[in-house]
Amino acid sequence: PNPPSVQNHSRLVVYRRLVFNNFCSFLNSCFPITRSILSAQEWQQLSQTAFSGIRAHSPLFRNIPDIFLQWLQKQPQPYLPQYPWLLEFMHYEWLELVVETHAAQLDKINHLMPQVEDPLNSYPLPNPTLQLACYRWPVHTLQTGHIPTQALPDAHCFAVVRQRND
């Protein structure tokens, strides 16, 4: 076979850059606080390493943050060991996106089933967007300028939900 032409190589470089930029746009929208805490160089390096290392099996772009997070969790060593809270915090940010983008139409859900007219035979239904998680780091307070230095003595558990008016 003939070696790829310079023109084909240039096209591949442009295509790779377009796909990488698209990949990064999904990461940037899912992990905005992580991105603001890490240096631009750290975030860029993490994004590039993940882009090169991930072998995604889903064609859906909306799955990119989940696939990225799974990849990061499977790394044999913490990717950025100077941020021991990073994985938990990124999971928390991702969980917020999962809840926000859940397909449930909350305004159409009756939260008492099956017989609303008989309160003694009714029971509450959980919000379908409900996600539960426990973390050792105070992920709910983490932000630029407020970085924890040690894990909490006990895990904090969260119920993340979307309300009807969200």
Could you say what each language-model-derived stretch is?
Residues 1-13:
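Charged, compositionally biased N-terminal leader segments and the immediate start
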Residues 11, 19, 23, 30, ...:
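Alpha-helical structural motif
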Residues 12-19, 31-32, 52-56, 166:
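A ubiquitous short alpha-helical element
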Residues 23-52:
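Amphipathic alpha-helical packing elements
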Residues 52-166:
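Hydrophobic packing positions characteristic
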